Amino acid sequence: MTSMTTRVLTGITTSGTPHLGNYVGAIRPAIQASAGADAESFYFLADLHSLIKAQDPARTQRSTLEIAATWLACGLDPDKVWFYRQSDVPETTELMWLLTCVAGKGILNRAHAYKAAVDRNRADGEDEDAGVTAGLFMYPVLMAADILIFNAHQVPVGRDQIQHIEMARDFAQRFNHVYGREFFTLPEAVIDEQVSTLPGLDGRKMSKSYGNTIPLFAPREELRKLVFSILTDSRAPGQAKDTQGSALFQLYQAFATPQESAAFAQAFADGIGWGDAKQQVFERIDQEIAPLRTRYEGLIAEPARIEAILRAGGARLRARYATPLLAELRDAVGLRDLSSQAATAAVHASEKIALPVFKQYRESDGQFYFKLNDGAGALLLQSDGFASPRDAGQVIARLKQAAQASDLQLPGVHAQVDADVVLAAMDALREA
């Protein structure tokens, strides 16, 4: 496997049974993207993350096997990408602790999943941390370690995960600053605005929470029964039917060529009967899924083969990336061979990565302005003009105490980035 310019890391949830919506929206496009020659792709089974919710050991093991078999059956090539199990790279959890020691608790308090749990408890009149594990609270640090252990440049995520990438950047910047070198690349979130979603059996988005899914590898007859159970209206054969909003048409379109979709749309206009339409949808889906199903059944019958693939991927990755980086980081923080005579001189402040900084200045209009830049010079906040430097300074003082997004909403102050990024900068200034 050759080293490439851009490292792209994708985490794979190891819980639940994959359904057609997962395949169309995530698995198929990710595998297609892995074939690109301009990226070094990392795919990992997030089995450690699953322990936050899953406490059935047998189910955890089975789910990991099923998800691994699914991705391999769908075409992921472990000879062309890095495919591994999170728990097979112990350097990840060691890095998590190193990051924990520089991570601000304030930024973790603002993590969406933790805040949502606290808000539910408050609404129910419970202690705000009732039922909240340290695993849930520390989830963003483990996710940061997943990314930073391989210095990934890009992480494809949904919009609900952007905050975690911003946190990973913050932890990386803090570590770089504290230990005086740029050990970590700052990762970027990659948002696919064209993510495909499929309707479920009831017409709503296909989702486990709605109980309306079609399992990806359902046996052929089960697949047929499920497709024929999809809700349709009462229009009879011979009556024109709308493709707009039709779950059947959307399912067909997700598996068909543009020419096939056009022909199916014409059949709708010509009044195809719902039974015939469902038969065509079933046949078109099964045409693509049947060979994948066969491969999946072969793989799931050979768990030792899957285990060997995952272990080999983890071992190669450790040797190539994780072990050398951890050795460097251990030395950086002082976890060293006690017999070593290596120099231990402190890094000069001038060599350290710069902190965020407020800059005040006067413009030609006679007004006093300020802005907040991060350590790399990127603009985070910009003010309007103030009558005096004292007025501007008072606002800066209030901003430095900001602990939540509402604290940033001051007259004459304009955030140029997400509030979480600005709040992380304030945390860094307070802890410096």
Curated annotation (Swiss-Prot):
Xref: Gene3D superfamilies: 2.30.29.80, HUPs, Tyrosyl-Transfer RNA Synthetase
Q: Which domain of life is it from?
A: Bacteria
**Which SUPFAM superfamilies does the protein's record reference?**
Nucleotidylyl transferase (SSF52374), YegP-like (SSF160113)
CDD domains, alphabetically? Answer: TrpRS_core
- Class of the enzyme per the UniProt entry, highest EC level: ligase
Tell me its family. Answer: Belongs to the class-I aminoacyl-tRNA synthetase family.
EC number(s) stated in the UniProt entry for this protein: 6.1.1.2
Where do the annotations place ATP binding? 13-15, 21-22, 158-160, 198, 205-209
Residues bound to L-tryptophan: 146
Motif 'KMSKS' region: residue span? Answer: 205-209
What subcellular compartments does it reside in?
A: Cytoplasm
Q: What does this protein do?
A: Catalyzes the attachment of tryptophan to tRNA(Trp).
BP-aspect Gene Ontology terms: tryptophanyl-tRNA aminoacylation
**Sequence motif 'HIGH' region, location on chain:** 14-22
Q: Which reaction does it catalyse?
A: tRNA(Trp) + L-tryptophan + ATP = L-tryptophyl-tRNA(Trp) + AMP + diphosphate + H(+)
**Which keywords appear in this protein's UniProt record, sorted alphabetically?**
Aminoacyl-tRNA synthetase, ATP-binding, Cytoplasm, Ligase, Nucleotide-binding, Protein biosynthesis
This chain's protein is named Tryptophan--tRNA ligase
State the oligomer form and interacting partners: Homodimer.
Its transmembrane ranges are none
**Biological source species:** Xanthomonas axonopodis pv. citri (strain 306)
Give GO MF terms, alphabetically: ATP binding; tryptophan-tRNA ligase activity
**InterPro entries, A to Z:** aa-tRNA-synth_Ic (IPR002305), Rossmann-like_a/b/a_fold (IPR014729), Trp-tRNA-ligase (IPR002306), Trp-tRNA-ligase_bac-type (IPR024109), Trp-tRNA_synthetase (IPR050203), YegP-like_sf (IPR036913)
What is the first-listed, main subcellular location in coarse terms? cytoplasm
GO cellular component entries? cytosol
Its gene name is trpS
Q: Report any Pfam family annotated for this entry.
A: tRNA-synt_1b
